Amino acid sequence: MVATGGQAQDQGQNQEPDVLNPTSAVTGLPQKRYYRQRAHSNPIADHSFDYPARPEDVDWRSMYPGIQQGQQVSFADIGCGYGGFLVTLGEMFPEKLSIGMEIRVKVSDYVVDRIAALRRRCADTGAYQNIACLRTNAMKYLPNYFVKGQLEKMFFLYPDPHFKRAKHKWRIINQALLSEYAYILRKGGLLYTMTDVEDLHKWIVTHMEEHPLYERLTEEEANADPITPKLYQSSEEGAKVVRNKGDHFLAIFRRL
């Protein structure tokens, strides 16, 4: 079996001084101030990742100790940040396995530690055994983790807008990647997008609507989805937008 996230290798290479990462005495959860990192990471850079050669090589049991024979990950939160929405998914869908994928090493470390703390705190109920996080570059390695038609839902919440025109190719929604997403998303599955940047929202909608394998949900359909209200402030980035009274731009698409 291969390691799934490459965290240990990257941490060894960074050679950063050891820093205590104390948990909160009140909540028992890790404190984000000990895991701070720049807001975004270059997805094109040659990061060092340990990734599986094929989905069959992923050691899911190391992330989901209670996983059942034949059970698969159903939901993927791409660029999960500090894991707020991932935790919400675990609470809303206890019977489903959800994975958060994050490229930034300290941020993914925080989510891993947060999930471990939640599991310890809820040891008597077994809650949060259905969520996990791994560090990887989703723009490069998603097909290495998921088989065709595996995912029911994919989430792209507040992705890096890459404002400069020369960097638009780095946006996680583009025609080439949409075909990869369509490959791992089952027919009828949903792809959720949320941003506070109107230009990026228009870019997403244009590219999604131009792709033959997606159709946008109507406003009525989107509002009827029980997940929709959670998209606005379950994630840390979404909560910040709410605090700053910013705009939210939502678009949900169905895999045809």
Swiss-Prot record:
One family name in Pfam for this protein: Methyltransf_4
User: What keywords were assigned to this record?
Assistant: Differentiation, Methyltransferase, Nucleus, RNA-binding, S-adenosyl-L-methionine, Spermatogenesis, Transferase, tRNA processing, tRNA-binding
Tissues where the protein occurs: Expressed in testis and ovary (at protein level). Ubiquitously expressed in all testicular cells throughout spermatogenesis.
List the top taxonomic levels of the source: Eukaryota, Metazoa, Ecdysozoa, Arthropoda, Hexapoda
> Is Cell inner membrane among the key words of this record?
no
Q: Does the keyword S-adenosyl-L-methionine apply?
A: yes
* Broad EC category: transferase
A GO cellular component entry from the record: nucleus
Q: What is this protein called?
A: tRNA (guanine-N(7)-)-methyltransferase
Q: How does it assemble?
A: Interacts with wuho.
**What is the E.C. number?**
2.1.1.33
Catalytic activity reported: guanosine(46) in tRNA + S-adenosyl-L-methionine = N(7)-methylguanosine(46) in tRNA + S-adenosyl-L-homocysteine
Give the binding site residues for S-adenosyl-L-methionine.
Answer: 79, 102-103, 137-138, 157, 235-237
Annotated region Disordered: the residues are: 1-25
Gene Ontology BP term (one)? tRNA modification
Which branch of life, at top level?
Answer: Eukaryota
The pathway that the record names for this protein is: tRNA modification; N(7)-methylguanine-tRNA biosynthesis
Q: Which InterPro entries match?
A: SAM-dependent_MTases_sf, Trm8_euk, tRNA_(Gua-N-7)_MeTrfase_Trmb
Q: Which family does it belong to?
A: Belongs to the class I-like SAM-binding methyltransferase superfamily. TrmB family.
Functionally, this protein is described as follows: Catalytic component of Mettl1-wuho methyltransferase complex that mediates the formation of N(7)-methylguanine in a subset of RNA species, such as tRNAs, mRNAs and microRNAs (miRNAs). Catalyzes the formation of N(7)-methylguanine at position 46 (m7G46) in a subset of tRNAs that contain the 5'-RAGGU-3' motif within the variable loop. M7G46 interacts with C13-G22 in the D-loop to stabilize tRNA tertiary structure and protect tRNAs from decay. Required for the elongation step of spermatid formation.
> Which residues are responsible for catalysis?
160
Gene Ontology molecular function: tRNA (guanine(46)-N7)-methyltransferase activity; tRNA binding
Question: Where is it localised?
Answer: Nucleus
